[in-house]
C-alpha cells in the first residue's frame, strides 16, 4: 500500500512587495544573511520549490507569505497575493494559497480576503497573531471575522515577533 500523500501547511514565500515594508525587510535581511539559500527558496514559486517538494516527498503545499513584522499596507498585500496567485494555476495539483492581509486595516482585510478567495481560489489566509501589539478581538475586527465565516475559509493565526 502506498503511503498517504504528504500535505504541508505554513509553507512560506517572500514577496518583494511586502518586503518593501522597512520593518519586514529588516527582519528578513537579517535571516537571509545567516541562512544560505533561504532568500532564493522563499522567493521561488516554481521549479526550485517543486524540486524541494519532490525531494521531501511532499504532494501538496498551502503557500502563504512569511510573518510580516510591522504592518503591510493594503496595496502591498494585494501585490503579494497577486504574485502568489500567478504561481498557483501553473501548479494547481501541487499548490494552494493563503492570503496575506493588512490586518492593521480590518475593513480592507475583509475585502482582500474576499478578493483572494473569489478571484484567485485561495483557501483562506495566514495572519500574524497580532499587528504591532494589537490583537484581533476588538469590535473593529467583527467585519473581518464575519467575512471569513461567510466565505467558509480557514484563518491560520501564526505566532510572530513581540
Residue ranges of predicted features:
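Helix-coil boundary/capping segments in enzymes
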Residues: 1-162
Amino acid at each position: 500500500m502506498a503511503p498517504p500523500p504528504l500535505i504541508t501547511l505554513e509553507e512560506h514565500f517572500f514577496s518583494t512587495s511586502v518586503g518593501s515594508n522597512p520593518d519586514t525587510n529588516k527582519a528578513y535581511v537579517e535571516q537571509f544573511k545567516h541562512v544560505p539559500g533561504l532568500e532564493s527558496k522563499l522567493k521561488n514559486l516554481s521549479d526550485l520549490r517543486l524540486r524541494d517538494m519532490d525531494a521531501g516527498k511532499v504532494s501538496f503545499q498551502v503557500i502563504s507569505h512569511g510573518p510580516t513584522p510591522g504592518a503591510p499596507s493594503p496595496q502591498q498585500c494585494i501585490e503579494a497575493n497577486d504574485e502568489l496567485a500567478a504561481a498557483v494555476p501553473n501548479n494547481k495539483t501541487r499548490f494552494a494559497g493563503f492570503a496575506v492581509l493588512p490586518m492593521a486595516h480590518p475593513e480592507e482585510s475583509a475585502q482582500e480576503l474576499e478578493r483572494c478567495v473569489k478571484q484567485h481560489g485561495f483557501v483562506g489566509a495566514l495572519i500574524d497573531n497580532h499587528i504591532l501589539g494589537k490583537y484581533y478581538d476588538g469590535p473593529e475586527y467583527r467585519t473581518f471575522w464575519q467575512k471569513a465565516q461567510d466565505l467558509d475559509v480557514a484563518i491560520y493565526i501564526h505566532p510572530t515577533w513581540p
